[in-house]
Regions:
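Active-site beta-strand/loop signature of hydrolases that rely on acidic residues for catalysis
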Residues: 60-66, 89-92, 99-134, 182, ...
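Metal-dependent phosphoester-hydrolase catalytic domains
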Residues: 4-9, 13, 21-49, 216, ...
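Surface-exposed cleft-lining segments at the edges of enzyme active sites
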Residues: 89-96, 124-128, 195-204, 231-240
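Beta-strand-turn-beta hairpins that frame and shape the catalytic cleft
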Residues: 50-61, 73, 174-175, 179-193, ...
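Conserved S-adenosyl-L-methionine
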Residues: 122, 150-157, 190-196, 344-348
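Solvent-exposed loop/turn segments at secondary-structure junctions
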Residues: 66-69, 125-129, 156-160, 187-188, ...
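Short aromatic-enriched loop/helix-cap "lid" or pocket-rim segments at secondary-structure transitions
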Residues: 72-77, 133-135, 162-166, 192-194, ...
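N-terminal, active-site-proximal structural segment of metallo-dependent hydrolase catalytic domains
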Residues: 2-144, 152-167, 172-176
Length: 367
C-alpha cells in the first residue's frame, strides 16, 4: 500500500511540475507576445537603388521562400513529424554547416541573376535567429545585391519559441524573420500590411504574424507599378486562416488596379493555384498530405496566375529530400493584373538543395 501511495504521489508531483512548467511558458509567451497593429506601417529603406526611375516596360521578378537557410535537401523538421511536444528523430534546427551551405546557395543564385532580374521577393529571410545560428542573412542578401533598394517586413518576432515543449534544453529559440524585398528601382512607397486572422491561443503567441509588403513605383504614363511580397499562413487545417487573409489581399490589389495601376502579387501562398492538382508531381501518392487551392473566383478571370506547371516549388519536410519519394507540390507563384502581359514564367529546379521551396521567375510587360 505504501509503495502504491508513493507511486501515486510521484505521478501527481510530476503532473503538477509539468503543469507549472507549461503555465510558466504560456505566461512568458503572453507577456512578450509581439502583436503588430492592423494599420499599414511604413517600411524603412535599408539600402538605396542605383537606378533613379523605372523606365523599362519589360521587367523580371523572382519570388523565393529561402527557408531561413535551415531547410535544404539534407534536412527534415520536427514540427512536420512530431508536432509541438518532442522532436523524435527529426531536426529542430539544421547543423550550422548546412545553414551556411544553404545561405551560400541563395547568395550565389542572387549574384548570378542580379543583372537580369529587377525585383527579388524573398520570404523566410532571417535577420538574426537561433535557428540559423544568428547569421545575419538579410545583411548578406543586401551585400549580394548592391544597387538594389532593400527593405524588410517582419512577420516572425519571438524572444523564445519554446517548442518542442518536452525538450526545453533544445528549444527552437529566438526568431526575428520576415519578408525581404529588393528592387532595382527606388519605391515611392513601401508599407507593411498586417494580414487579418490568427491562430488560436496558445499557438498564437509563438506563431508568425503574417503580413504583405507593398511597394509602389512610379511608372511611365502616370501610373504606378505596385508589387506585393506575401507569405500566407501554413499549418492551417481547412485553410481557415487563409480564408480571412485572401479577401484582404484581393481588396488591396483590386483597389490599386481600379486606380489604373499595374499590380503584381508574388510569394508563398501556401495554397495551390486554382484548378491545379496538388498531387500533380506524385499522382495518388499523397503520403497523407493535403494542399488546398485558391478559390476559382478569388480574382476576376482577366487576372493571370503565373506559375510553371512542370516544376514543383515546395517539398514536404517530414524527411530529408529524396527525389521520387518526398512529396512535392506547387504553392509559390505570381498573380498579375490585366494591364500586364505575362511574357515568360519559369520554375527553377534546384533539386531543393538550399530550401524546401524553389524560385519562380516571371517576365512581364507593362501595356
Amino acid at each position: 500500500m505504501k509503495k502504491r501511495s508513493l507511486f501515486r504521489q510521484l505521478i501527481i508531483g510530476l503532473l503538477l511540475l509539468l503543469g507549472f512548467y507549461l503555465l510558466g511558458i504560456f505566461a512568458y509567451g503572453w507577456s512578450g507576445d509581439w502583436q503588430p497593429g492592423p494599420e499599414p506601417t511604413a517600411l524603412i529603406p535599408d539600402q538605396s537603388a542605383s537606378e533613379k526611375t523605372l523606365t523599362d516596360s519589360v521587367l523580371t521578378l523572382v519570388s523565393w521562400n529561402v527557408g531561413y537557410g535551415g531547410l535544404g535537401a539534407e534536412s527534415d523538421f520536427f514540427y512536420d513529424d512530431s508536432g509541438i511536444w518532442y522532436s523524435g528523430s527529426s531536426m529542430i534546427r539544421s547543423p550550422k554547416n548546412l545553414v551556411e551551405k544553404n545561405l551560400n546557395g541563395v547568395l550565389e543564385f542572387l549574384d548570378r541573376n542580379k543583372d537580369s532580374v529587377d525585383f527579388f521577393l524573398l520570404q523566410e529571410a532571417d535577420i538574426v535567429s537561433d535557428r540559423s545560428y544568428n547569421i545575419r542573412q538579410y545583411e548578406a542578401y543586401q551585400k549580394s545585391l548592391p544597387g538594389f533598394a532593400a527593405d524588410f517586413a517582419v512577420n516572425y518576432k519571438c524572444d523564445r519559441v519554446p517548442v518542442p515543449l518536452l525538450e526545453p534544453w533544445n528549444a527552437y529559440g529566438a526568431v526575428l524573420s520576415g519578408l525581404a524585398s529588393f528592387s532595382r528601382y527606388p519605391p515611392a512607397e513601401a508599407t507593411r500590411h498586417q494580414l487579418p486572422g490568427h491562430y488560436p491561443m496558445p499557438d498564437r503567441m509563438f506563431q508568425l504574424d503574417r503580413c504583405a509588403a507593398l511597394h509602389r513605383f512610379p511608372a511611365p504614363g502616370g501610373k504606378d507599378l505596385v508589387v506585393i511580397n506575401l507569405h500566407n499562413s501554413a499549418y492551417d487545417p481547412g485553410d481557415k486562416i487563409k480564408a480571412i487573409q485572401l479577401p484582404y489581399l484581393r481588396d488591396l490589389a483590386l483597389a490599386e488596379f481600379a486606380k489604373g495601376n499595374f499590380v503584381v502579387l508574388g510569394g508563398d501562398w501556401n495554397q495551390c493555384p486554382p484548378h491545379f492538382r496538388f498531387d500533380t508531381f506524385m499522382p495518388g501518392n499523397t503520403q497523407g498530405y493535403l494542399q488546398g487551392n485558391l478559390p476559382p473566383d478569388f480574382f476576376p478571370e482577366d487576372w493571370t496566375f503565373a506559375y510553371d506547371p512542370t516544376v514543383p516549388t515546395n517539398r514536404k519536410v517530414r524527411d530529408p529530400y529524396l527525389k521520387g519519394k518526398t512529396f512535392e507540390t506547387l504553392i509559390d507563384f505570381f498573380l498579375v493584373s490585366p494591364n500586364l502581359k505575362l511574357t515568360a514564367v519559369h520554375g527553377i529546379d534546384q533539386g531543393f538543395q538550399f530550401s524546401d521551396h524553389q524560385p519562380v521567375m516571371i517576365t512581364i510587360t507593362l501595356l
